[in-house]
Structure formats: structure tokens, C-alpha cells
């Protein structure tokens, strides 16, 4: 079917192509086949068939410099002929599919089978009239008042309850899936790209990019479509996502101009004409093939032939952009195997979430909470299974011994159905114990809490891409933050200048500067900066000018404007195409250089970069009249002391601008960087200010109070970094903390062979607060070192911020990676877990608050559920063993299970966070999930509930003067006695739900209760349904209506929970040291073996990425 739809699609397009042959000089299929070529072959084809890239632009009716005119009719025609830049998403699961998935629950299946057997047997009547008598006690009262006719009710009621549970689960999954789709589209809307339309450079949503658009590409971009390079500067692309080639591919208009969607720009910049979008791009073609294969695969899976690699297209490459899925081609046993790698947050709810985990590149280990919950759920599940098995065995043995040993009855064939009915009843009791014991509400509580938090976190400028990151953030013990843009405003202004042997503490009047130096300075800045960087007039009068592009370059262009010059005429005179050679900025060079050809045929190269790095390469400097003089090492040292250090101590970034002339005979070897980028002449040093964000010092103080260490990891000079760290409050004067640069850091952590040693890192990181002049490698090493450290009791949970392409490995290695939404590159965003849409550090503090709130919500739910579990299991078990019947019937247990699991998780998982969450230390990895206070609450309330229920069970009939419900025969009518027990049990749970809102021993359990309307409505709603069940539930719910007095007693005993809660709060925890702490993760048993292997793979993966990035 997929093939058919594809062929229809192409046939339709071919018809379109025929109709529009005159409209454009090339068809869709021609462009598709052109994009399949590479290297020289592509250049030749382009030249011969199209007359080069200019000829291609003519055919596509676009201008290489001005782009598309932007007329709506033209844009619509392009959409119609060449398609839109989006790939249709996978259809969401229907409600029925979700119902079917919910039905797969093992305990529910067991219950369904038991209920069906019960139903079947209730309609079976043994032949002959004597059966009842001769079967003796076993059949006692079976036929009383025709009650046997109603024997089907219990089976039917269980089935009905199962239907309720399934529908509620399916509805939850459906709403969750809908929410994830909303999150997905939000992430996609964030994705924009720079294109030229009508001579204007505009940011366009990726979905609106069309064939013929001229796209501007720069370092860090994720290409949104296929295209042909028009002009490029030192352009290197990582094509591993499509071709599996791990080395970066050099692209140039004359050697290899083909650019493919979904590949990363690792270095350089350029312009390309878009030739294929959406399903017609190289990535889109693969997606379409995979999408067409999904249905076949699903059919195969149904037949049991599950496809080995799980290639289903689980995400969508909406807007033709590869952020949501990356196609990895792995060489496996010599064969290239395709692997779909969805990289955005799960788009299709839980099932897709699982699929995503299965298929994506080995992600970090399970989040802290997931690890603890899995362990706890397994422990509880095992205990529940054991209890239910023991219950069934005891019931069967009790029955067998009583009938066949004590009363010496023979086994009579006609009695077999009656005996089987008893055994089925025992089995149902056992399953009921299991249903109540197994905490299947745990994953639901986690999901609800995370989904609720993620939605609210968007308002706090946190766009969560991986759900578990939200909760992991609550455990964070360390944050390694960038400086620029995160702690500072990222609005660069040149405030000091050193030129012609004079340091100006304010930008001087241009008249006082040597004219030669001024001309060189203005030309060097105007030409040697990205032409996409501009300063535009302010949006509103009196506002600040708008900075577009690289902010450091904006600061330098601002200096040109302050010196009463303009950079645009110079750029117009030397357009980007005329730049002879560009050495783009990267983390190894730490400088950018541009070569131009002068009118006399010679060459001039302008350079700019970190002052200490560029000055080392200078052999001359311009003097007071603008003439070069020799610049000796002695002069350099003096300049560092008198100019650079004082500027850096004021918190300024220092940028040195320099130049060098080359003769054209012979032409230099431009690839010999070491010789080219040397022997420079310094023009000036500029001090650029990037002020600290006003809200940052307070945010850092909150982190420190919350037990989180904030470290600054920056590429800036050590003095600049220290000055900013003091302003932010990361360090305070006189404190014994380390501020070191990358060089010193590497000296301290590496042995004689140059290998990193964990023991050496352990001596550095605890005191380290500022790491300056650091490379992405240093950042990754630091993060890895802190995470792998075992010196503290608790393993550190590290959050990292990053914006550059090279921050990818560190972001992946961190427990939580934050990418910058504004300044961040697409590569960084893709490697991250959370995107900060405002690039602001204080948003990270909000993420910590939400993370802790998730942890607390889950703990509240656990405290509540475990109390119910403990009590219900003990009651069912003891009751069954003593009275041969469970005081709480299967249907009642299912209702309690529904209260416990679905409603309580909704009520307790949606509590809003408060500032008080930041007043305590992180929980840490090895702290038990259930604290001693929680254990005290669980056991305390459990004891209260058990005393009440057993009192009611054994002496209840005397207290209320009613018939006893104990030892009632099979199918006997519901008793008032057992109804009171059931009703009191539910009332105690309802009031205990209010107690469960507090888990740290607080006395006021009502504090802030009305701020959570969901909680209030669920408590009142459950109460109302309980009234209906007791008064009108009748036989299906095994309930007898109660009068007002008995109701008041039930509510009174429930209210006792609140009073008892105050009693428990008074008991000091120190008395309860004997309590075992459940759900604890120790260093050794932190993860199952397969996860440990996955973690190792992850490290290798990150390190491989890092090695690949080292040429940067």
C-alpha cells in the first residue's frame, strides 16, 4: 500500500511537471536526481546541464543575491510544483488502539479470565437434585432464596470494573499523547532559518522554506532542506547522519557544492539555493520509504515477525528538519543498517516513548527517580505476588482439609462444579490481593506529574525535550554554566580601546586617533566579520539599536559606528563573493581571519580574536602615527600587564584586531595556517562589556541555598571570568575557591602521559568555581569527571548549559543538558534535554523548582499508595485466611485501586511548586525514595487503619448490633457488616489523601489546598461516587445501603486519620532508626546490567563525537 501511495504521488507530480514545464526551467524529478550526485560528478552535471549554479538559479527564477521576490502567487506555485518543506507525521494512535494497549496489562488479563470462569460456572447447574445436600458444607446455602441465580453478578461486576479501569487508562494515554503532540509542534515552531527574500535577510519558519529560496548557512546550523552552494567560506559539514561518514566534508562551489537536509554545519558559513524540500529532499526520501514501510512492518509484527531494528518512523521530520528524527546509518557487520533516531520529546505517548528509548542513540542511564521507582515497584510486585500466592494456597488447603479430611467427605463428580466455583472464588481473592499490591499507578503518577510540569515549565521559559530531565533537575547538585548570554545579557558594547600606544577608558573622538590606524581598524572590523552580522535601528524611538548575528561582532560594529564611520559601504565595495579566503572562528583557532585581494594584485589579511592569542602571533604593532613598529616579547608582557589585565579585571572581554600584507608573487599557500596566521601587525585592542543580567545574582544565591554548586565554564580570559563570577556571586572575595584556566586545569588532571586521571580530577572539582579559557573538550572532561567521581557519599547530578556546536558531547554527557534557545546552535539544541527559550540562568532555577516538585509529588503519591497497599493486602490476606473470604470484595478492591491509582495520582501529582522547595538540599542519588518520615507515616497510618478494620471485622456486628458477614456461604446477599468495613476503609483513604499532601513532617496538611482545584474536585468527586456505590451499588458492589448513623460513624472513623496524623507527626524520627528505607539506590546496584552497558556505550559515543569535534 505504501508503494502504491508513493507511485500515485510521483505520477501526480509528473502530471504537474508536464503542466508547469514552462513555469520553471527544471522539473521536480530533475532536481531530485541532481541532488543524488556528489563531488566532481555533481559539479560537471551542474555545469553541463544547467550552466553552473547561476544557471540553476535562473531556471528556478531566483536571484543568488536577492532571493525570491516573495510574491504570494509565486510562492503558492512553488509549493504546488516542488512541495512544502514538511513530512506528514505518523498518524496518532486511535482511542481503540489505546484501549487495546491498556487491555494488555497482565493483572487485568488474569482478572478477566477469572471473571469469565466465574460467569461460566454460575450458569452451570449440576444434574440431579441431591447435589447440594451431598456436597455438604461446601454447598451450604448455595441455593438460599434463589441466590444462585445472582451468581453471575460478581463475574459481570469484575468485567465491568476492568472496562472502567481500561477506559480511564486509555483516556489518560490519549490526553498524554495529545499533549506530547502539542509539545512537538511547539519545538517545531521554534525552528527558524535565515533566508534572503526580496533582498532582505529574514528568519523564516523551516516549514515555509521553498525551492528557489536563498538560505544563509552558518556554523552550528542544521540544514532544513537540500541545496546547492552558491558561495561558501571554509565550509565543513558533518554528513554522518545521512552517509555514516564520520569525517567532516569540505564544501565549496567548485569542488563539492551539494548540501543535504539534516546535516550539520560544523564550520564556516555560506549561501545556498534550495533545490529540494520535504519528502523530496534526500532525508525526506528516506523518511517516505520508511513511512511506507511502517504499515508492512506492523502487519509483520502482528504475525510475530517483528522487524529486527525497529525502523518505524516514530517521530516526524516535520518542516523537513532533522531535529525530530535523525537517520543514522551504522555499519553493522559490513552492511549498512538504517536506524531511526527520534531526537525530540516523545511524540506519541508512552508506547512511542518506549520505542524512542529503544531506537535512539544510547541515552544516559535511567533518571534517578525512574531507577528508584523501578526498584521499588519490583520489590512491591514480588511481595504482592508472594502474598497472593500464599492467600490462594491457604484458602485451597483450608477448604480441602475442612471438607475432605475433617469431615471425611468423598469427592463426588456431581459436586465438581461447586468445588470449582469455590476455587475460582479463591483465585479471584488472590488476584484481587495482587491487583491491590502491584503499584501500576506509579508510572501513571510519574507521567501525569511530568506532563503537568512540562506544560507549566513552558511558561517559565523551559522547553523540555526529554521528559525525565525535568525530574532529574530536582536532584541536581552542580550546574556548569556558560558565561555569555546565560549569566550576562549577551548585549556587547565596546567601552574601552587601546590604539596607537594609548589606552582610552572611553571610546575616543575619531579625530584624536591616527588616520591610518582608524582606516585599518574600520576596514578590518567591517570586512572580517560575518556579513550576516548587522546593527539595525531600534524598533521604537529612544530604544537600543538591534543587534543581529554574532554579538561580539555586533559590539565591534558598534565601535565602528561610534567612531562616526559606517561598515555597510565597505561591505558593498567588497561583497562576500570577493573575499579571497576566510578562516572562520572555531574553538581551536579562537580567531577569525579574512583575506582580500588588493587592487595592485597583492593580498591583505585581517584578523581578530582573543587578545592574548592574537597578540602572540603579532610581530609588529601600529604606533602613535599609525606606522608599524617592532613588537618584542618584552612589549607583549608589558601590554598584558598594563592593558589586557586591567580591562579583564573590569569584567571586559578583550579582542585584538590585526592585519598582515602578502605579496602575490609567489602566492602564499593558504592551507599552511601556521605560517599564514603569524607575523601579524596589531592595530588595536578593544574592551567589550557584556553586563551581568540583573536577576542572576539572586538566582545563584537561591541555587547555593538549595545545595547546588554553580560553576562558570567559559572561553573568556581568566580575569574577565573572575570579575564576572564575583559580580554574579559565584565566588566571594576571600573564599578558598579555585579559578583556573584550561591550561592549568589540564596540567592538574593529566598524568605524565597526558591521560586524564579520576583521582586528579577529584582533587580539583570540589573547589573549582571558574574554569576560564576552556575548550569544549575541557568542558566535557570536567562534566564527566564530576559525574564519575565516587569521592562523595552521593554521586553528583550535573546540569550543563551550552550553545555551541562543540558543546554537544558535554550536553549529552551531563545528567541534564540545557541549550540556549536564542543563541544556541541547532546542534546544541539537538544534544540537549531542555531548551532555555530566554537563555536566562534564572530559568534554570525554575527548572530545579519544578524538578523537586515532581519528586515530591511522586513521594506524596507513594506515601498514600503504600499505606493503602499495606492495609488492603493485610486485610484481604488475614481476612481470607481466618474467615475464608476477603472482607473487601474483588469489585470493591478494583474501585479502591481506581481511587488509589488514577485519581490519587492525578490529585497528588498536580500540586504547584513553592519557593520553600529551594530551601533544602537535593535528595541525591542514593537517598532512599521513601524517607524515614514517609516510612513513619505509612506504618503509622497503616496501624490505625488495620486496628479499625479488624475491630469492625471481628466485633463490628456487636458494636452496631447487626448480622455478622463472616463465614457467609457462596453467593449470599451483601451484608451490612462488610459494607461498613468497605465504607470505613474508603473514608480513611480519602482523609489520608489530605495527610499525604505533606511528606516532610509538616503539621498543617491543609496549607495551600485550595491552590490545587484538581485535588479538591477529586476528593469531593470520590466522596460522591462512594455514596452512590454504597447506597445503590447493591449486589455488583456487594453493598447494603447504610442509614445516616452508620454513615456518620464511617466518616468519623475516616476523620480520625487527620487527628492520628498529628499524633504521628509528634513522634521523633530518631526513635525509628530501625525502619528499613525502601527504594534505595546504592552505588553498586544502581542499574541493571544492560543499562550499565548502555551507559558505557554512551560514554564511547560522546567521546567519539568529541574526537570528531577536535579539529574545531
Swiss-Prot record:
Stretches assigned to the Extracellular side: 116-152, 394-426, 879-888, 953-970, 1034-1043
Catalytic activity entry: Ca(2+)(in) + ATP + H2O = Ca(2+)(out) + ADP + phosphate + H(+)
Region: Calmodulin-binding subdomain A, residue numbers: 1106-1112
One GO MF term: PDZ domain binding
Membrane-spanning ranges: 95-115, 153-173, 374-393, 427-444, 859-878, 889-909, 930-952, 971-992, 1012-1033, 1044-1065
One biological process term in Gene Ontology: regulation of cytosolic calcium ion concentration
Biased composition (Basic and acidic residues): 298-311, 351-363, 1099-1112
UniProt-annotated catalytic positions: 482
GO cellular component: intracellular membrane-bounded organelle; postsynaptic density membrane
NCBIfam families per record: ATPase-IIB_Ca, ATPase_P-type
Family, as annotated: Belongs to the cation transport ATPase (P-type) (TC 3.A.3) family. Type IIB subfamily.
Protein name stated in the entry: Plasma membrane calcium-transporting ATPase 2
Organism in which the protein naturally occurs: Oreochromis mossambicus
Amino acid at each position: 500500500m505504501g508503494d502504491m501511495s508513493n507511485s500515485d504521488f510521483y505520477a501526480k507530480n509528473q502530471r504537474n511537471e508536464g503542466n508547469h514545464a514552462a513555469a520553471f526551467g527544471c522539473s521536480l524529478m530533475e532536481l531530485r536526481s541532481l541532488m543524488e550526485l556528489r563531488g566532481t560528478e555533481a559539479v560537471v552535471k551542474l555545469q553541463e546541464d544547467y550552466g553552473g549554479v547561476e544557471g540553476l538559479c535562473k531556471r528556478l527564477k531566483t536571484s543568488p543575491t536577492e532571493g525570491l521576490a516573495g510574491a504570494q502567487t509565486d510562492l503558492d506555485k512553488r509549493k504546488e510544483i516542488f512541495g512544502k518543506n514538511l513530512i506528514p507525521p505518523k498518524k496518532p494512535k486511535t482511542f481503540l488502539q489505546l484501549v487495546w494497549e491498556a487491555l494488555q496489562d497482565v493483572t487485568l488479563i488474569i482478572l478477566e479470565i477469572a471473571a469469565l470462569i466465574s460467569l461460566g460456572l454460575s450458569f452451570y447447574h449440576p444434574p440431579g437434585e441431591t447435589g447440594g445436600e451431598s456436597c455438604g458444607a461446601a454447598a451450604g446455602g448455595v441455593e438460599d432464596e434463589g441466590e444462585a441465580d445472582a451468581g453471575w453478578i460478581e463475574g459481570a461486576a469484575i468485567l465491568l470494573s476492568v472496562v472502567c479501569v481500561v477506559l480511564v487508562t486509555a483516556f489518560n494515554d490519549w490526553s498524554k499523547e495529545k499533549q506530547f503532540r502539542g509539545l512537538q509542534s511547539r519545538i517545531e515552531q521554534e525552528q527558524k532559518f535565515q533566508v534572503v527574500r526580496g533582498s532582505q535577510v529574514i528568519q523564516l519558519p523551516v516549514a515555509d522554506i521553498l525551492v528557489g529560496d536563498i538560505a544563509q548557512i552558518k556554523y552550528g546550523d542544521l540544514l532544513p532542506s537540500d541545496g546547492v552552494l552558491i558561495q561558501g567560506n571554509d565550509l565543513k559539514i558533518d554528513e554522518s547522519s545521512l552517509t555514516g561518514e564520520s569525517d567532516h566534508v569540505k564544501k565549496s562551489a567548485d569542488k563539492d557544492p551539494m548540501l543535504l537536509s539534516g546535516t550539520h554545519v560544523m564550520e564556516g558559513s555560506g549561501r545556498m539555493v534550495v533545490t529540494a524540500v520535504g519528502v523530496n529532499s534526500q532525508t525526506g526520501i528516506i523518511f517516505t520509504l520508511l513511512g511506507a514501510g511502517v504499515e508492512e512492518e506492523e502487519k509483520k509484527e502482528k504475525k510475530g515477525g517483528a522487524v529486527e531494528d525497529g525502523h518505524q518512523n516514530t517521530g516526524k521530520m516535520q518542516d523537513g528538519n532533522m531535529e525530530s528524527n535523525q537517520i543514522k546509518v551504522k555499519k553493522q557487520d559490513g552492511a549498512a543498517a538504517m536506524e531511526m533516531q527520534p531526537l525530540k520529546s516523545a511524540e506519541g505517548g508512552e508506547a512511542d516513548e518506549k520505542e524512542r528509548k529503544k531506537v535512539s542513540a544510547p541515552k544516559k542511564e535511567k533518571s534517578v527517580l525512574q531507577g528508584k521507582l523501578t526498584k521499588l515497584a519490583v520489590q512491591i510486585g514480588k511481595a504482592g505476588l508472594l502474598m497472593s500466592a500464599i492467600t490462594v494456597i491457604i484458602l485451597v488447603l483450608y477448604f480441602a482439609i475442612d471438607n475432605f479430611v475433617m469431615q471425611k467427605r468423598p469427592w463426588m463428580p456431581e459436586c465438581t462444579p461447586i468445588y470449582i466455583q469455590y476455587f475460582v472464588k479463591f483465585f479471584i481473592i488472590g488476584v484481587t490481593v495482587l491487583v491491590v499490591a502491584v503499584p501500576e499507578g506509579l508510572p501513571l503518577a510519574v507521567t501525569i506529574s511530568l506532563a503537568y510540569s512540562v506544560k507549566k515549565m513552558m511558561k517559565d521559559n523551559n522547553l523540555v525535550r526529554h521528559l525525565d530531565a525535568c525530574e532529574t533537575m530536582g536532584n541536581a547538585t552542580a550546574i556548569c554554566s556558560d558565561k555569555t548570554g546565560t549569566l550576562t545579557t549577551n548585549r556587547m558594547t565596546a567601552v574601552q580601546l587601546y590604539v596607537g600606544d594609548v589606552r582610552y577608558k572611553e571610546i575616543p573622538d575619531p579625530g584624536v586617533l591616527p588616520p591610518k590606524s582608524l582606516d585599518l581598524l574600520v576596514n578590518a572590523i567591517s570586512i572580517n566579520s560575518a556579513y550576516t552580522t548587522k546593527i539595525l535601528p531600534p524598533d521604537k524611538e529612544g530604544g537600543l539599536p538591534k543587534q543581529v548575528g554574532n554579538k561580539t561582532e555586533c559590539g565591534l560594529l558598534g565601535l565602528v559606528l561610534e567612531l562616526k564611520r559606517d561598515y555597510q559601504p565597505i561591505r558593498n565595495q567588497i561583497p562576500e563573493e570577493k573575499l579571497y579566503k576566510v578562516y572562520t572562528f572555531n574553538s581551536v583557532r579562537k580567531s577569525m581571519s579574512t583575506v582580500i585581494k588588493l587592487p595592485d594584485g597583492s593580498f591583505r589579511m585581517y584578523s581578530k580574536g582573543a587578545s592574548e592569542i592574537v597578540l602572540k602571533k603579532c610581530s609588529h604593532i601600529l604606533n602613535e602615527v599609525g606606522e608599524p613598529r617592532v613588537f618584542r616579547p618584552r612589549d607583549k608582557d608589558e601590554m598584558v600587564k598594563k592593558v589586557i589585565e586591567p580591562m579583564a579585571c573590569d569584567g571586559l572581554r578583550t579582542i585584538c584586531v590585526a592585519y598582515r600584507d602578502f605579496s602575490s608573487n609567489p602566492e602564499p599557500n593558504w592551507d599552511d595556517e601556521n605560517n599564514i596566521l603569524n607575523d601579524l601587525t596589531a592595530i588595536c585592542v578593544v574592551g567589550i562589556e557584556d553586563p551581568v543580567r540583573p536577576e542572576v545574582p539572586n538566582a545563584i544565591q537561591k541555587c547555593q541555598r538549595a545545595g547546588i554548586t554553580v560553576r562558570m565554564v567559559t572561553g573568556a580570559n581568566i580575569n574577565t571570568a573572575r570579575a564576572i563570577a564575583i559580580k554574579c556571586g559565584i565566588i566571594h572575595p576571600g573564599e578558598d575557591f579555585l579559578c583556573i584556566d584550561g591550561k592549568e586545569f589540564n596540567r592538574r588532571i593529566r598524568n605524565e602521559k597526558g591521560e586524564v586521571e579520576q583521582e586528579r580530577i577529584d582533587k580539583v572539582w570540589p573547589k573549582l568555581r571558574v574554569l576560564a579559557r576552556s575548550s569544549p573538550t575541557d568542558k566535557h572532561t570536567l562534566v564527566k569527571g564530576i559525574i564519575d567521581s565516587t569521592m562523595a557519599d552521593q554521586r553528583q547530578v550535573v546540569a550543563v548549559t551550552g550553545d555551541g556546536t562543540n558543546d554537544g558531547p558535554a550536553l549529552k554527557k551531563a545528567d541534564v543538558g540545557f541549550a540556549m534557545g536564542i543563541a544556541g546552535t541547532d546542534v546544541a539544541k539537538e544534544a540537549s534535554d531542555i531548551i532555555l527559550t530566554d537563555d536566562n540562568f534564572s530559568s534554570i532555577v525554575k527548572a530545579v523548582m519544578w524538578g523537586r516538585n515532581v519528586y515530591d509529588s511522586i513521594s506524596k503519591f507513594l506515601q498514600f499508595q503504600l499505606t493503602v497497599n499495606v492495609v488492603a493486602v493485610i486485610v484481604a490476606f488475614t481476612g481470607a485466611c481466618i474467615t475464608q473470604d476477603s472482607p473487601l470484595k474483588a469489585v470493591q478492591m478494583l474501585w479502591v485501586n481506581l481511587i488509589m491509582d488514577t485519581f490519587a495520582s492525578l490529585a497528588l501529582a498536580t500540586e504547584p511548586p513553592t519557593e520553600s522547595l529551594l530551601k533544602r538540599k537535593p535528595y541525591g542519588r542514593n537517598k532512599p525514595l521513601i524517607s524515614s518520615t514517609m516510612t513513619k507515616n505509612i506504618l503509622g497510618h497503616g496501624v490505625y487503619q488495620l486496628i479499625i478494620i479488624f475491630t469492625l471485622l471481628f466485633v463490628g456486628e456487636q458494636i452496631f448490633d447487626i448480622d455478622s458477614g463472616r463465614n457467609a456461604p457462596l453467593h449470599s446477599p451483601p451484608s451490612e457488616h462488610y459494607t461498613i468495613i468497605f465504607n470505613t476503609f474508603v473514608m480513611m483513604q480519602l482523609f489520608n489523601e489530605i495527610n499525604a499532601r505533606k511528606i516532610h513532617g509538616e503539621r498543617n496538611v491543609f496549607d495551600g489546598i485550595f491552590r490545587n482545584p484538581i485535588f479538591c474536585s477529586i476528593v469531593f468527586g470520590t466522596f460522591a461516587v462512594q455514596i452512590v456505590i454504597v447506597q445503590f451499588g447493591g449486589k455488583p458492589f456487594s453493598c447494603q445501603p447504610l442509614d445516616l448513623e452508620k454513615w456518620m460513624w464511617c466518616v468519623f472513623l475516616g476523620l480520625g486519620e487527620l487527628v492520628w496524623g498529628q499524633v504521628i507527626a509528634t513522634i521523633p524520627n530518631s526513635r525509628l532508626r530501625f525502619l528499613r528505607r525502601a527504594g534505595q539506590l546504592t552505588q553498586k546496584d544502581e542499574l541493571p546490567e544492560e543499562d550499565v552497558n548502555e551507559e558505557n556505550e554512551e560514554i564511547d559515543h560522546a567521546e567519539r563525537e568529541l574526537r570528531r569535534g577536535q579539529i574545531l
